[in-house]
From Swiss-Prot:
Keywords: Cell cycle, Cell division, Chaperone, Cytoplasm, Isomerase, Rotamase. One of its GO terms (molecular function) is peptidyl-prolyl cis-trans isomerase activity. Belongs to the FKBP-type PPIase family. Tig subfamily. This is Trigger factor. It comes from Streptococcus thermophilus (strain ATCC BAA-250 / LMG 18311). Involved in protein export. Acts as a chaperone by maintaining the newly synthesized protein in an open conformation. Functions as a peptidyl-prolyl cis-trans isomerase. It catalyses: [protein]-peptidylproline (omega=180) = [protein]-peptidylproline (omega=0). Residues 163-248 form the PPIase FKBP-type domain. It comes from the Bacteria. One of its GO terms (cellular component) is cytoplasm. It is found in: Cytoplasm. Its main location: cytoplasm.
Amino acid sequence: MSVSFENTATNRGVVTFTIGQDKIQPALDQAFNKIKKNLNVPGFRKGHIPRAVFNQKFGEEALYDDALNAILPAAYEAAIAELGLDVVAQPKIDVKSIGKGQDWTLTAEVVTKPEVKLGAYKDLEVSVEVSKEVTDEEVDAKLENERKNLAELIVKDGAAEYGDTVVIDFVGSVDGVEFDGGKGENHSLELGSGQFIPGFEDQLVGAKSGDEVEVKVTFPEDYQATDLAGKAAVFVTKVNEVKAKEVPALDDELAKDLDDEVDTLDELKAKYRKELEAAKEIAFDDAVEGAALDLAVENAEIVELPAEMVENEVHRAMNEFMGNLQRQGISPEMYFQITGTTQEDLRKQYEADSDKRVKTNLVIEAVAAAEGFDATDEEIQKEINDLAAEYNMEVSQVSELLSPEMLKHDIAMKKAVEVITSSAKVK
């Protein structure tokens, strides 16, 4: 195989490669055997036309597309490997010369991985705003949140206050005309929860059971139902009941209700403190890792990041997110409906920092290469076992999905991150 590379711009070039007759002829034979099965030619049984008759009647070039499709992927990969190129996007293939009895010549416009010149990545001094210390106030706040979760709603006679729940019937109208979705009966609404559009809940504060209130609001300009966006509406609202939260007493009985492994409130507080300390330790380590990686990227020099790499990262991140949702039984349609967003909104969210993620990955890869990191068979098997447990899959399934090279790459990346973060010093 003849192979050459012409650099056309930063991280871009054209690969020219030839495919020899030793690969072409078997591919033509395979293409002929595939095509002739469905041929009906007068004078011959279906699928039994001789090769010479086929060439005379249709021409050998009728086989070229199938033959080229069969041998192109391997030929292209061999050309890239021979040149030692690290291609980061789908190539644009063009056939330059193809014909009977000659080698076929093709070109591939490729985008290559940018060069990374590492700066300092060890013993970095970083600042983080996350504290590992757990205060008494934080323990009390967690306890109070858990206590509120056990609160019961008790019907009250007085006026509704923020935090109370009102049970209401309502009918909404715009310019005196009722609209779809604007009606409800016996709907429970916690005042101050922000469940309804801005201004609605505020106008029910002070209402009592049996009151009828005309709630006047304006739909937000970005309201999901575009036919209502920006319009003024009136909701005739009847208050059926007002309920207040009644929280249990802060005592040992509460502690036992919240956690059957403790007997006293002090024991529960001690347990909550340990849980908060563990969570803060993780948050602190994550913050140090993020700060150290950011600084390592800042210290490095990356020669012009190809737009294709950023676009690939957006697609990868979105597909990973959607895959995680589907593993939880949530379809994309369901997610967008629940969140009131669109696929384009999600795309913009991932576009916002995709450039940074690509640069970070490039620097981590460069560190792994500089440190000569590899992975042993034992490390690869452990990675497979860990992934199988994380995603509730069979070990064999993970082995089929991920090649040893992919796993080696991931393990080397983890080692590189560990080198960067473990040596970092917090100011």
